[in-house]
């Protein structure tokens, strides 16, 4: 029962995201989104997070303090697509932008890049509506590759040489950024030839 409104909020937001992608495809004969992943935290994960934050373990506390119970990850092709999708989502009048963090413009010290937005999404009841937060992470394919590898090699491991890992992942982030830049330039060049 606790998860139900978060699922409804995520479903509502997924409709908006799919409309955005379809409209973009129709208007520009292109589409910014490669794929979309969704997840809802398990009860155990929610309770663990409340415990870690030393908060009371109940529905009301979780609702008031956790903004990542429902999450959507949007994987785009290029950085410009990430910003386009983020701007479009912020324009929807039925959504509330609660918080945003641009880790593309200002990557985390370890090299992590992504655009995070916490959106308040309306959930309608018979005689009222209530907003539930959905964490939206928007990143490119190369940013997602970096994050997936970092999660697999460092985050999930207990025996890590942090200094070496940090250096390798910073270099990896730079190489991926260069690859993405070259591919974007190639795409733009090809679009000019077609146009």
What are these regions (language model features)?
Residues 69-75:
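Terminal, regulation- and interaction-focused segments at domain boundaries
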Residues 63, 76-183:
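Long beta-strand-rich cores associated with HINT superfamily self-processing modules
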Residues 1-67, 177-180, 187-195:
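Charge-rich, low-complexity segments
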């Amino acid at each position: 029962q606790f998860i139900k409104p978060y699922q409804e909020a995520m479903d509502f937001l997924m409709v908006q995201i799919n409309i955005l992608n379809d409209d973009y495809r129709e208007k520009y004969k292109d589409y910014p989104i490669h794929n979309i992943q969704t997840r809802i935290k398990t009860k155990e994960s929610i309770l663990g997070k409340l415990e870690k934050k030393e908060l009371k373990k109940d529905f009301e506390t979780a609702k008031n303090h956790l903004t990542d119970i429902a999450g959507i990850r949007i994987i785009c092709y290029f950085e410009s697509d990430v910003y386009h999708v983020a701007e479009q989502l912020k324009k929807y009048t039925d959504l509330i932008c609660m918080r945003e963090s641009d880790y593309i413009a200002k990557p985390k010290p370890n090299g992590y890049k992504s655009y995070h937005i916490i959106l308040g999404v309306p959930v309608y009841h018979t005689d009222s509506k209530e907003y539930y937060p959905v964490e939206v992470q928007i990143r490119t394919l190369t940013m997602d590759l970096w994050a997936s590898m970092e999660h697999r090699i460092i985050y999930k491991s207990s025996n890590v040489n942090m200094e070496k890992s940090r250096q390798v992942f910073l270099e990896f982030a730079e190489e991926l950024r260069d690859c993405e830049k070259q591919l974007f330039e190639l795409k733009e060049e090809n679009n000019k030839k077609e146009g």
